[in-house]
Amino acid sequence: MSVDISNFPNLALADTPVELRSLPFERLPVLCNELREYLLRSVSRSSGHLASGLGTVELTVALHYVYNTPFDRLVWDVGHQAYPHKILTGRRDRMQSIRQKDGLHPFPWRGESEYDVLSVGHSSTSIGAALGMAVAAESEGLGRKVVAVIGDGAITAGMAFEALNHAGDVHKDMLVVLNDNEMSISENVGALNNHLARIMSGKLYTTIREGGKKVLAGLPPVKELAKRAEEHLKGMVVPGTLFEEFGFNYIGPIDGHDINALVETLRNMRNLKGPQLLHVKTKKGKGYEPAEKDPIGYHGVPKFNPDECTLPKASGGKPSFSAIFGQWLCDMAAKDERLVGITPAMREGSGLVKFSQQYPDRYFDVAIAEQHAVTFAAGLAIADQKPVVAIYSSFLQRAYDQLIHDVALQELPVLFAIDRAGLVGADGPTHQGAFDISFLRTVPNMVIMTPSDENECRQMLYTGYQCNGPAAVRYPRGSGTGIQVESEMQALALGKGRIVRQGKGTAILAFGTLLQQAKAAAEALDATLVDMRFVKPMDEALVFSLAATHDQFVTLEDNAIMGGAGSAVNELLMRSKQCKPVLNLGLPDRFVEQGTQEEIYALLGLDGTGIQRSIEQWLQA
């Protein structure tokens, strides 16, 4: 059931930015209130990212009101905060479909709207992309403006600073809006800051400043005195020295919920020359008290009743793989004081909350810095510590060079606990863990394990921890099978699989949790079902023995078929001249769309029914 737009009379008049810009300025505060309430009612019915969007309502309205989007280009970082942007750009009536199969994409997406100029999902890309657009805008000479909106978390990543450094060097006209909702840069927000921002972004101030530079250019002592006076004035209330050193003109911080101040400041800044940075202070979850008090809990929400002011409690069902990892980490830390846990800004998602509380001195959240996380782990390993890097599959992609150069090349004992491997579901193609087996399998000295259930996951984590070189355990998002998890930890035989069901004719080699979906197919086809456990080193002896007693193979994995575990089986069989027909089942050669995990596995033929159907059709062909 969709939200009744008749309850939002001002928002009903602003289905697009063109309509928004036709509204009188005086109506914007009421429009913002309606937009915030509409967002709350919509997301609570669909599930999705809530707290970030509640905090960017006024900023979104102001940007589209001042800038001529889509001609002027507005680039959002990550995209969690872009729900108000979607509502104001012709997608309001489809918001209930967000993150659902065939629905709106969870993040800004180029194929969805002309207002989404950059497809996003991973952090810290906005400034670099916006700079490229700014260079192109200068070349085309049409007066196009470019704005990047980035959060205080995303701006900490190395590539954001690389882009800031480059932008300050080439000095193109662009605006970076720093959406600061964590008070991590400055707490100075209020009337004085808003007033100063208006002054410093205004024409009179900038004219005097630039003119003064020219007049005083021949008088170094006087020029230096004037510069210091300006810095002293700004330094009393402005934490912008860092950005000024990058070559940006820094304005702010200003109240990101004061629509009047935002519009006036953006109007003043719109035609300023060179790189500009506007520091905006916002409150995550603004306008909905439960989200203001618990912005982490309300970052991503299931369907809920906002009038009850509480989220539904998770059912006490099967533990998630993340929880299994978190418990193993605590148990292992109790046994080995050298263990160090590392995560790039994914404490809650990776199951590290308990560990961070029990072992705060051995827990490191390095922020959105995947490359640093891996090299930091390498340094710890060199110093005889035992680092465990908890990281999402899709985010490990950013640290590939560090994994090769700083860890694997030096055969350092770093354990990678790779969460969200396989299909994650509603977050869509930017977050599907589709490639980790493929890119890890090519790395020498790497051990890669694929647990079929949560008990195997625990034992594999222990196995990887005992390795003398780099090891990876990949496991999916969501709950396990409900199997009894053994408290005792035992190292598995390295590179050895196990036969789950003995059959004949066809041997199904399963890598990971899809083993559970293959059981019914194996029964129906009287096929042998194997839990391979290790992608690398692979159980070659087991594969060879199966090749001698079976007519064909089926490989099964929740990774891209190209370069994946099935490809490793193909290579092994061809190299040994024991060529057998092989059907590789896994993720296709495309970016996999959003939907529930169950929907997408069924769509790709990787649920129980689909696996059996694919094998039967292949055997009959």
UniProtKB/Swiss-Prot annotation:
EC number: 2.2.1.7
Cofactor note: Binds 1 Mg(2+) ion per subunit.
GO MF annotations in UniProt: 1-deoxy-D-xylulose-5-phosphate synthase activity; magnesium ion binding; thiamine pyrophosphate binding
Membrane keyword on record: no
Classification via Gene3D superfamilies: 3.40.50.920, 3.40.50.970
Any one GO CC term of the record: cytosol
Reaction(s) catalysed by this chain's protein: D-glyceraldehyde 3-phosphate + pyruvate + H(+) = 1-deoxy-D-xylulose 5-phosphate + CO2
InterPro entries in alphabetical order: Dxylulose-5-P_synthase (IPR005477), THDP-binding (IPR029061), Transketo_C/PFOR_II (IPR009014), Transketolase-like_Pyr-bd (IPR005475), Transketolase_BS (IPR020826), Transketolase_C (IPR033248)
Matching Pfam families: DXP_synthase_N (PF13292), Transket_pyr (PF02779), Transketolase_C (PF02780)
GO biological process: 1-deoxy-D-xylulose 5-phosphate biosynthetic process; isopentenyl diphosphate biosynthetic process, methylerythritol 4-phosphate pathway; terpenoid biosynthetic process; thiamine biosynthetic process
Entry-linked CDD domains: TPP_DXS (cd02007), TPP_PYR_DXS_TK_like (cd07033)
Required co-factors: Mg(2+); thiamine diphosphate
Listed pathway(s): Metabolic intermediate biosynthesis; 1-deoxy-D-xylulose 5-phosphate biosynthesis; 1-deoxy-D-xylulose 5-phosphate from D-glyceraldehyde 3-phosphate and pyruvate: step 1/1
Binding site for Mg(2+): D152, N181
Xref: SMART domains: Transket_pyr
NCBIfam families assigned to the protein according to its UniProt record, in alphabetical order: dxs (TIGR00204), PRK05444.2-2 (NF003933)
Sequence similarity: Belongs to the transketolase family. DXPS subfamily.
Function (record text): Catalyzes the acyloin condensation reaction between C atoms 2 and 3 of pyruvate and glyceraldehyde 3-phosphate to yield 1-deoxy-D-xylulose-5-phosphate (DXP).
PANTHER family assigned: 1-D-DEOXYXYLULOSE 5-PHOSPHATE SYNTHASE-RELATED (PTHR43322), 1-DEOXY-D-XYLULOSE-5-PHOSPHATE SYNTHASE, CHLOROPLASTIC (PTHR43322:SF5)
Complexes and interactors: Homodimer.
Name listed for the protein in its UniProt record: 1-deoxy-D-xylulose-5-phosphate synthase
Protein's organism: Aeromonas hydrophila subsp. hydrophila (strain ATCC 7966 / DSM 30187 / BCRC 13018 / CCUG 14551 / JCM 1027 / KCTC 2358 / NCIMB 9240 / NCTC 8049)
